[in-house]
Structure formats: structure tokens, C-alpha cells
Design a protein with these regions (language model features):
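The feature captures the beta-strand-to-loop junction immediately N-terminal to the Walker
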Residues: 39-41
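ABC ATPase nucleotide-binding domain helices that frame the ATP-binding cleft
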Residues: 47-50, 146
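Helix-to-loop junction immediately C-terminal to a conserved catalytic motif
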Residues: 54
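Conserved ABC transporter NBD signature motif
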Residues: 61-70
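Non-catalytic connector elements of ABC transporters
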Residues: 253-422
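ABC ATPase nucleotide-binding domains
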Residues: 35, 76-82, 86-237
Length: 422
């Protein structure tokens, strides 16, 4: 059984444990050949969603389709799904070869095909020299690679990954991501990958769905989520360090413009945003500034004016490969902590000193303080259209703007609709 041309469709999916809905009215359309990532904090419902797709948990309400076929009542073994878990789930009494071959043997695959596929998978995951060993003779990273090889050696309708790289060190994790992407493109079937690591989600996902408390927050490419988050939660969750948030008021300026006023600064609203911000004059809003959009005035690669800076007291300096991350606090009676990711090193002598940082005003975000929904974003890095990265049924990536299914488009374009209403 395979998803055919329709991919995987999830309609109004609900999973309850007692009175609590851990997955609440979830709607998704996973395209054929797409590597789709579910990301969110612990307890958001992402692993439960994966288990519902696999048939390991009964559906409380809603529908799951593989292609045109409703699979709600189909047994896990009959869904033709391959799973990789964080806890390896390999058989301790079998050799590495036997573990990898287990699923193929259970489906009575020819011996020559089993040998060929096991050899190819072992080569891809660099475990050829381990085929005769038992799991107790392997390291944690080697066991995880065996689990990946066992799941990916067979032809499945859907591949499911539940934080499979969490137990690997940084170098192995990076290599394993490349291996998963390589094999995914070869297979050409849809895959759903669960992680709490937003960096991993950005690296792997053709599209990413952000979940919180069982509810879908937003679906889009990594760039779309980063530059056009639909609410404050997505804005803070996607990005490291998280976005800075300041409570500001919109005030008219003497020259007929508008300013975002905070006890520590009075930032001018760029001319291209004036019409969209004007309806909020006199109201409180939450201003979002990404850490990399704060730079020393003389080193900024964007337009800087005297009144487009925020002064802060340097509390911590963390050197990075390309610059440094600086933790500061505003100079008001009640200091507000914020963070800047600088492209240049800041000497340790700046600790405890006051420094000005220029704000890239064309990259600001504004949110409603009541519900956290986005009201305004600056333009995308490339153009004003939401960017999607889709894949063809063969698994080859096809870059460029692409249309979303209606249920997802309504979620990820909520902020755009609010901007137009303004």
C-alpha cells in the first residue's frame, strides 16, 4: 500500500487521553516525496501525531489518508510504514546484518536482494565493518546507525522518524542528516521527521510544521517561518538565540511619521510600513527584533540613522566562529534583557560598558500583545512571496515558490491577512 499521487492527508485529527486532547484538530497535506518535519517543545503532540500515522495509537477523531485510502482502521503492519525511534529498538540477540535484514526477511524478500540492500545501507551509514557484531559490542552512535539502516533498507509507503539523532554527537548527527537526505531522495516517498531541535528542522525539512499544546501553529519553509512567523511563539521558537521582544507604543512624530516608543528608545517606523502601522497609533504593540538585526552602527550592512539605535549595558560576551553573541540590558529604570548576534568580535573590555546597537528597521516584526498574533513583518530576504521548497515524486528538490494546501495556507498566511486588514 502506498500514498500514490495524493501523499499523506490528515483531516481534523484529534487524539485524546482521557479529557485531554494531545493532538487537537490537526490538518496537514504531506506531498509525495516530501520530507516533512514536525517541530515543537516537549509535550506539543508531535510524537503522538507520528504514532497515529504509524497506527500505534487509535484515532479519537478525524481521518488519515495514504493517497486515496483511509487508514484509520488499518493495522500498523498493513500500512507499510518504516519507523526509526530515538531508543534504537534493535534486537540484542541478532547481528547487525540480521537486524538490518529483519524487515526484508519478514516480507520474504529474495536472498540476493537482501544481501544487496543490506550491503548498500551498511555502506551508506559506514557500518560495513560491523555487520557480524551484536548490538552489545556497538557504541550508541553505531546502534543508532543500525536502526536507521534497518528502517531505510526497505521500500515503505511512508518513513517516520522520531528524534532519531538525539543520541548522536554533533559530528555524527551532521553526517547522519546528510545520509537521511540522500536516501530520502533515492526512495522518493514521503517522510515525517519529529524533532524538538529547530536547527535540525531547518536543515532537513522541505516544509516544517510548528506545534504547540497539540495545535498546529504554522506550516512553511524554514525561511518563511523565520522571516514571517504567524505569532510570537513561532518567532521565538524558530531561531537561536530567540527573537527579542519589547513592549512599545505607536506615537505620531513631529514630521508626520510614526515612532515605536519604549523607555529606552524611540525608533522611527520606516516609510514603507507607515500605512500598515498607522491604525495602531496610540496602542501598545510588541516589537520583535532578531539578534542578528542588531549591529554596531559602524559595522552595520543596513541603513543607520542616529535615532535607529538601542543603547544597552553589556552583561555577557560569548565568542562564536564568525563573531560573538552579546547579552545586554536596556538602560531604563527597569532594565530589559536582550541579545545581539554580532558579525565582529567584541573585546572583553566591553563588559559592563554601555554600547549603541543599530536596528535594521526593515526587518522588524510587530505582534498583538493580547493574543501574540503577527501584525507586520519586514520583506523576505528574496522577495515578498512566502518561499516553499517542494520535491517531485522522484524525490528531486524543486526550489521556488509553491502553492500550499488550503488548510495550511490559512494557518501560515494568517499574519498576512491581518496586515491587509490594517
Amino acid at each position: 500500500m502506498g500514498p500514490a499521487s495524493g501523499g499523506i492527508v490528515i483531516e481534523h485529527l484529534v487524539k485524546r487521553f482521557g479529557e485531554r486532547a494531545v493532538v487537537d484538530d490537526l490538518n496537514l497535506h504531506i506531498q509525495p516525496g516530501e520530507l516533512f518535519v514536525l517541530v515543537g517543545p516537549s509535550g506539543c503532540g508531535k510524537t503522538t501525531t507520528l504514532r497515529l500515522l504509524a497506527g500505534l495509537e487509535p484515532v479519537s477523531d478525524g481521518r488519515i489518508y495514504f493517497g486515496e485510502r483511509l487508514v484509520n482502521d488499518i493495522r500498523p503492519r498493513d500500512r507499510n510504514v518504516a519507523l526509526v525511534f530515538q531508543d534504537y529498538a534493535i534486537f540484542p540477540h541478532l547481528t547487525v546484518f540480521e537486524n538490518i535484514a529483519y524487515g526484508l526477511r519478514a516480507r520474504h524478500a529474495p536472498r540476493n536482494l537482501i544481501r544487496e540492500r543490506v550491503a548498500n545501507a551498511a555502506r551508506l551509514f559506514r557500518i560495513e565493518h560491523l555487520l557480524g557484531r551484536k548490538p552489545r559490542q556497538l557504541s550508541g552512535g553505531e546502534r543508532q546507525r543500525v536502526a536507521l539502516a534497518r528502517a531505510l533498507v526497505r521500500d515503505a509507503a511512508l518513513y517516520l522518524y522520531d528524534e532519531p539523532l538525539a543520541n548522536l554527537d554533533a559530528q555524527l548527527r551532521h553526517q547522519a542528516r546528510e545520509d537521511i537526505l540522500t536516501l530520502h531522495r533515492q526512495k522518493g516517498q514521503p517522510a515525517v521527521y519529529v524533532t524538538h531541535d529547530q536547527a535540525e528542522a531547518m536543515a532537513l525539512g522541505d516544509r516544517i510544521a510548528v506545534m504547540r499544546d497539540g495545535k498546529l501553529q504554522q506550516v512553511g519553509s524554514g525561511l518563511d517561518l523565520y522571516e514571517r512567523p504567524c505569532n510570537q511563539f513561532v518567532a521565538f521558537f524558530i531561531g537561536s538565540p530567540g527573537i527579542n521582544l519589547f513592549e512599545v507604543e505607536v506615537h505620531p512624530d513631529q514630521d508626520g511619521g510614526l515612532r515605536l516608543v519604549h523607555p529606552a528608545f524611540r525608533l522611527p517606523v520606516p516609510e514603507e510600513f507607515q500605512a500598515r502601522v498607522a491604525p495602531y497609533t496610540g496602542r501598545r504593540l510588541n516589537l520583535g527584533i532578531r539578534p542578528e538585526h542588531l549591529q554596531p552602527p559602524k559595522r552595520a550592512d543596513f541603513a543607520v540613522s542616529e535615532d535607529s539605535t538601542i543603547r544597552g549595558l553589556v552583561n555577557v560576551i560569548e565568542p562564536t566562529v564568525s563573531g560573538c553573541t552579546v547579552y545586554l540590558s536596556t538602560l531604563e529604570p527597569t532594565p530589559r534583557d536582550f541579545v545581539a548576534t554580532l558579525k565582529a568580535r567584541l573585546p572583553g573590555s566591553y563588559l559592563g560598558r554601555e554600547v549603541p546597537l543599530a536596528v535594521n528597521l526593515r526587518k522588524i516584526h510587530l505582534f498583538d500583545p493580547e493574543d501574540g498574533q503577527a501584525l507586520l513583518h519586514g520583506p523576505l530576504a528574496t522577495d515578498d512571496r512566502p518561499i516553499r521548497v517542494t520535491v517531485s515524486p522522484s524525490g528531486e528538490p524543486a526550489n521556488g515558490p509553491a502553492e500550499q494546501p488550503t488548510s495550511e495556507r490559512e494557518t501560515s498566511e494568517a499574519s498576512t491577512q491581518r496586515e491587509e486588514q490594517a
